[in-house]
């Protein structure tokens, strides 16, 4: 079974969403009469202002698989609270055997992240971040681990509400 990794392709639609294709794999299904070839596509979609979604699509042809993945990514979007083009605080994410460390960075640092994580930050609109992956480098698991970490982000207002204090008391 041959594996085909596509370069990350970017696209911006008329609805203001940024789309990136992370990978396209050739997959096979073995049946009594032989093998049935198909394609699986992994994509991320973001609005450049903190909203992000991931999708996976499978079909007999590449364009159809990519289209299915993009539609699924649009349906699965969620908002991540950003602070001046970076993350609120350091956070860990995990999925399967992939683990990621995501940390905010000073202005001018840029996106220091490898492979699929960079695509996630690009479509999300993060300009400064440092990210490190540990364990498996499977693109699907890395994207899911990155999204897991991003979901764990909390704002000072969230923490203040949980503790029953004001934001000024939390920030000192």
UniProtKB/Swiss-Prot annotation:
Keywords recorded for this protein, A-Z: Ribonucleoprotein, Ribosomal protein, RNA-binding, rRNA-binding
Domain S5 DRBM: start-end pairs: 17-80
One CC-aspect GO term: small ribosomal subunit
InterPro entries to which the protein is assigned, alphabetical: Ribosomal_Su5_D2-typ_SF, Ribosomal_uS5, Ribosomal_uS5_bac-type, Ribosomal_uS5_C, Ribosomal_uS5_N, Ribosomal_uS5_N_CS, Ribsml_uS5_D2-typ_fold_subgr
Keyword Hydrolase: no
MF (Gene Ontology): rRNA binding; structural constituent of ribosome
An individual GO BP term: translation
Superkingdom of origin organism: Bacteria
Family per record: Belongs to the universal ribosomal protein uS5 family.
General function of this protein: With S4 and S12 plays an important role in translational accuracy.
Domain notes: The N-terminal domain interacts with the head of the 30S subunit; the C-terminal domain interacts with the body and contacts protein S4. The interaction surface between S4 and S5 is involved in control of translational fidelity.
HAMAP family: Ribosomal_uS5_B
Subunit record text: Part of the 30S ribosomal subunit. Contacts proteins S4 and S8.
Name of the protein in question: Small ribosomal subunit protein uS5
Source organism: Burkholderia cenocepacia (strain ATCC BAA-245 / DSM 16553 / LMG 16656 / NCTC 13227 / J2315 / CF5610) (Burkholderia cepacia (strain J2315))
């Amino acid at each position: 079974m041959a594996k085909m990794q596509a370069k990350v392709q970017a696209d911006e639609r008329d609805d203001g969403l940024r789309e990136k294709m992370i990978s396209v794999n050739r997959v096979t299904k073995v049946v009594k009469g032989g093998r049935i070839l198909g394609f699986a596509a992994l994509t991320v979609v973001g609005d450049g202002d903190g909203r992000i979604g991931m999708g996976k699509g499978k079909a007999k042809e590449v364009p159809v698989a990519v289209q299915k993945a993009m539609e699924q990514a649009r349906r699965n979007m969620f908002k991540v609270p950003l602070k001046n083009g970076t993350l609120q605080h350091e956070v860990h994410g995990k999925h399967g055997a992939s683990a990621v460390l995501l940390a905010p960075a000073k202005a001018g640092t840029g996106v220091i992240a490898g492979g699929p994580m960079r695509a996630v930050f690009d479509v999300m609109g993060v300009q400064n971040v440092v990210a490190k992956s540990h364990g498996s480098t499977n693109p699907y698991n890395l994207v899911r681990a990155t999204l897991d970490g991003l979901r764990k982000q909390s704002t000072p207002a969230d923490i203040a509400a949980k503790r029953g204090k004001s934001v000024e008391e939390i920030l000192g």
